[in-house]
A protein has these predicted regions:
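C-terminal alpha-helical "lid/dimerization" subdomain adjacent to the S-adenosyl-L-methionine
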Residues: 2-9, 13-27, 146-206
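Conserved alpha-helix/loop element of class I SAM-dependent methyltransferases that forms part
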Residues: 28-47
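A generic alpha-to-beta junction signature in SAM-dependent methyltransferases
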Residues: 41-43, 66-67, 141
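Short glycine-dipeptide loop
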Residues: 46, 141-147
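Class I SAM-dependent methyltransferase SAM/SAH-binding core
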Residues: 50-107
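A short acidic, Gly/Pro-enriched loop at the edge of an enzyme's catalytic core
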Residues: 106-117
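A short SAM/SAH-binding and catalytic strip from SAM-dependent methyltransferases
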Residues: 117-129
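A short glycine-rich, Lys/Arg-flanked "PGG" loop and its adjoining helix->strand segment in the class I
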Residues: 131-143
């Protein structure tokens, strides 16, 4: 297996020593992307927030600073990521402002209408059934709540060679903005707004239940 294939597989489900390196790198390399992605998103200080695919836990940490009277939950299906994210957020966990747990987007372990905001940063490429998974996200989101998707890649002619290679090697589903909007609309999301940074191939999608 090539080095790029190994890395993309670790992005899907980071594990072991290589996974820890990848997660630590993502905590740093995704900082600017996440800053741009979150700048448009309202986070009230009493919000209940769920970050799906929390990885190393830095995005959870940043949102917990804004929801300082609420709580931010981080979910990842990698047991190792859960452990690393707990370590990164231990002080906030002790203050009951953060909770990290193992879970999958196919069956989010919360009641309906739970969260004010749900985020997915650099993760939906790997979701097994995107339409069903978006429906599950919508189930646990409060009516009027916000679902935010932040991606470093979307289907684009400018980046088609790179993205096609990554999709094939990493078994990634890289959607176009139009495809993403259609699927979200079909499962019942509304007020769908998509912003792009075309020269970087960045995408931010914000929608409501």
């Amino acid at each position: 297996m090539s080095e790029i294939a190994k890395r993309l597989n670790q992005c899907r489900k980071p594990t072991g020593d290589l996974g820890k390196i990848v997660v630590e790198d993502m905590n740093e390399s995704h900082f600017n992307l996440t800053s741009w992605g979150l700048e448009k998103i309202k986070i009230e200080n009493n919000f209940l927030v769920l970050d799906i695919g929390c990885g190393g836990g830095k995005t959870v940490n940043r949102m917990a600073e804004r929801a300082d009277q609420g709580k931010v939950y981080g979910m990842d299906y990698s047991d190792d990521c859960v452990k690393w994210s707990i370590d990164f957020n231990m002080d906030l966990i002790k203050e009951n402002k953060v909770e990290i747990f193992q879970g999958t987007v196919e069956n989010i372990p919360f009641e309906a209408e739970k969260f004010d905001l749900i985020t997915a940063v650099e993760t939906i490429y790997f979701w097994p059934d995107i339409k069903a998974n978006f429906s599950e996200v919508r189930r646990v989101l409060k009516t009027g709540g916000t679902f935010a998707i932040i991606n470093e890649m979307y289907e684009s002619e400018v980046f088609s060679d790179r993205n096609t290679e990554f999709a094939a090697i990493g078994n990634m589903n890289i959607l176009s903005p139009e495809e993403l909007k259609i699927i979200l609309s079909e499962v019942g999301f509304n007020n769908i707004e998509i912003d792009l940074v075309e020269e970087k191939n960045w995408l931010r999608c914000v929608c409501n239940k």
